[in-house]
Amino acid sequence: MGLAGCPLALTLGDPAGIGPDITLLAWTARTRETIPPFVLIGDAAVLAERARALGLTVPIGEVSEASAATGLFPQALPVLPVAGLGPVMAGRPEEAAVPAVKQSIERAVSLVQKGAARAVVTNPISKAVLYGAGFPFPGHTEYLAALASAKGAPLHPVMMLASPTLKVVPVTIHIPLKDVPRLLTRDLILANIEITASGLRRYFGFKRPRLAVSGLNPHAGEEGRLGREEIDIIMPAIEAARAKGLDVSGPHPADTLFHASARSTYDAAICMYHDQALVPFKTLAFEEGVNVTLGLPFVRTSPDHGTAFRLAGTGKASPRSLIEALRLASAMSEKAEGRA
């Protein structure tokens, strides 16, 4: 079987969150819209219990190999089992589930590295629960990079939030705001610019991506009066990127970077910290937004929301972002494979 016939590998996420809900709802949506075949690396009993809570009739089929999932997908939701997951109560996360959560992520990476899956799509995890169990990585992005680089040179993963109308990249991700100025460097910003440009070319078909880089300080530093990061760090990174032939503008004041007219001038915005990128993105594209990790040797996407424990099992969770994540993962893998 070529990659075209392989399923997407969908991870378990935190089983007490809305991952099971949106997985079930995404599969049921296949009769109304195009959903690329996927296999959930998880637990059939947890899915069946959540389906009962939601009043859904969903046939669930366990498979021993991912290759069986594509043929099964039209009739049943394929599940590749993970070991060691006990009973799960919706909305009540437990550290006891962490080994199964990690196993699901590791299995997904292994499948895509072996060519048994086209891409990795991850359901939401709870960082607080993982940290409580001794998880040493800030989040999914860093863990996936560690798994992917286990046998080679370290990777530099880049988190991009993508929708049809807006793409944003935070240079720093899951760190306290007070640490951002200290951690920003010319080389870090330049690496994010280069990896973003490469990803836009490879996976999204942009021949010469236009990148807009935000400043860190109000008014992009007001020529040094409100901070020197723009002069000492950000502008040198932009100049280095331009010297390599990249189309990069900035540093721009962040407060005027996201209105409609400004968005028409670039293909992706490079921002200095998490909320500078994600607040405008989630305001403009919450349900259709997808989290993409660039800089990995495989495609990875996820919904752009969290575990939403309070919604688990209530029927109020929307599968839209997961559906868009599945579709984008499929489209990106086709582009990378030269089939689109």
What residues fall within each predicted segment?
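Small-molecule pocket liners
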Residues: 38, 141, 157-158, 167-169
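Short, flexible loop segments at boundaries between secondary-structure elements
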Residues: 146-158, 162-166, 294-310
